[in-house]
Amino acid sequence: MERIFGRPIVTQEEMRARIRELGKQITTDYTGKDFVLVGVLKGAYAFYADLARAIRIPMRVDFLMVKSEGARKKTSGKAKKVKVVTELTEDIKGKDVLLIEDIVDSGLTVQHLVKTLAKKKPRSIKVCTLLSKPDRRTINVAIDYVGFKIPNKYVVGYGLDYQQKYRNLPYLAVLDLEGEEDQE
């Protein structure tokens, strides 16, 4: 595989293998349930698509889009505000929801989304993330399925971006940016 940018932290082959494993586990856990797969755009789009194909049971699919305002900078300490800008189109009342995220860093976005989805009265809500940065967690959130735990590095590729670029990389690469805003 040709390297387009950066130093890979997770290769395309490693991601494919892990997503197959997650798909098998989710298939087992959700068999016989009224199941809705909810992706968080834009970052989770690549992971979401590959994971959906790896899940071998009938499901509904839907998406949310969120916007973070006032992202916390390392220097300012200003807390960010999470806002849902595109709502679900599926009615999730009484259904089992699996929220698909690209990365869980502080936990703020996931916490906000789980609370928002809970107001729609689903039967259950679980969280699956491609990447987890446990060292950055400031909010204790339940993550039911984790693709990879990674160190506190800014990563791009496979849906994750820097200024809307690099989402198309087929692997995850470290981007070295001193003093940049939080990733989540």
For each predicted feature, which ranges?
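PRPP-associated nucleotide enzymes
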Residues: 1-184
